[in-house]
């Protein structure tokens, strides 16, 4: 499932956005700029929804520090600041989109989907890799029309690999994304689940193209 970081100090609006996106994304809510910056740096997210008028540290400062640290996660600013100067400043700092309040939740979702499509993280309801078809709506996997049962984190792991082809994925990044950096389990669980997915997809293009990078992580080559 898509992971979104929502940095918004208005509790009512934050909860409304959270509820509206609940069937589409896993949304992490934080309510001030310092906490937002910490989460954006330590977690793994597909998109950041960022208010500007935040306590502790304003949204412009958060965005500036993220980009200076090389964090390229798409950022959609949503704010009551509607002047052309504010919009220009946001884009100069590295924002990917800018939505002024008040807004329709439906429009917010459309903009989110557009940004995710642009970054390759969202492709309607299916992902295809060689002879594998993954349905994101039903959480099902088929290999040449034959169902293959991948449960829970197995399914999430496959989707994460397919969404990050030709990208070196450190074990720590996979662990933070799927289990959370504050999880009580150990990082060795990543190897366990990679082994499970490989076994269930034995003989597929995925199993052939998934490389283990010793002491680093994994790399899934794209389909040639």
Curated annotation (Swiss-Prot):
Posttranslational mods: Phosphorylated by CiaH.
Modified residues (4-aspartylphosphate): 51
Keyword Phosphoprotein: yes
Location in the cell: Cytoplasm
DNA-binding region, residue range(s): 124-222
Response regulatory domain: residues covered: 3-116
One of the record's GO cellular component terms: cytosol
Keywords: Competence, Cytoplasm, DNA-binding, Phosphoprotein, Transcription, Transcription regulation, Two-component regulatory system
GO BP of this protein: establishment of competence for transformation; regulation of DNA-templated transcription
Job of this protein: Member of the two-component regulatory system CiaH/CiaR. Involved in early steps of competence regulation and in penicillin susceptibility.
Protein name: Transcriptional regulatory protein CiaR
Species this chain originates from: Streptococcus pneumoniae serotype 4 (strain ATCC BAA-334 / TIGR4)
